[in-house]
Amino acid sequence: MPLSDFPLRASVAVSDIDRAVTFYEGTLRLPVVRSGPSARIAGGSRVYRSGGDEALHVYQSTTAGSSQATVATWYVEDLDQVVDELTANGVDFLHYDGLTHDARGITARAGGGRIAWFADPDGNTFALESDG
């Protein structure tokens, strides 16, 4: 069977699961599906639902925040609304040199559409994209 027959879930390392829970469940309002151990840390991982399915696995690790690339992207219909809601919840959107962002951090996406980036407390970068 090809891998395309199976769901894919992003996994993100964090340095402090309690701080991550505050961010992912409180600030981003992602519903937790389950929690469990991570390596030798009881309760050191969470799986969150997004888009109607298990989509994001967050786990405590010493490698947290080491990626400088976007680790996961949400594809949204109304980028302005989602950015405004997350900003109201305390999310700061990133601005990158060489790109023209509006005041909220939204910029044109290569190939069309628009995109905005933000980071979790460990510096893991996420994107929001829309075609409009």
For the regions a protein language model found, what residue spans apply to each?
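Amphipathic alpha-helical segments
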Residues: 19-31
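Short amphipathic alpha-helices within nucleic acid-binding modules
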Residues: 23, 79-85
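N-terminal beta-strand motif that seeds the catalytic metal site of vicinal oxygen chelate
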Residues: 1-19, 69-72, 129-132
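Conserved short beta-strand elements that form part of the metal-binding/catalytic scaffold
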Residues: 31-77, 94-95, 104, 125-130
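Vicinal oxygen chelate
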Residues: 1-3, 74, 83-132
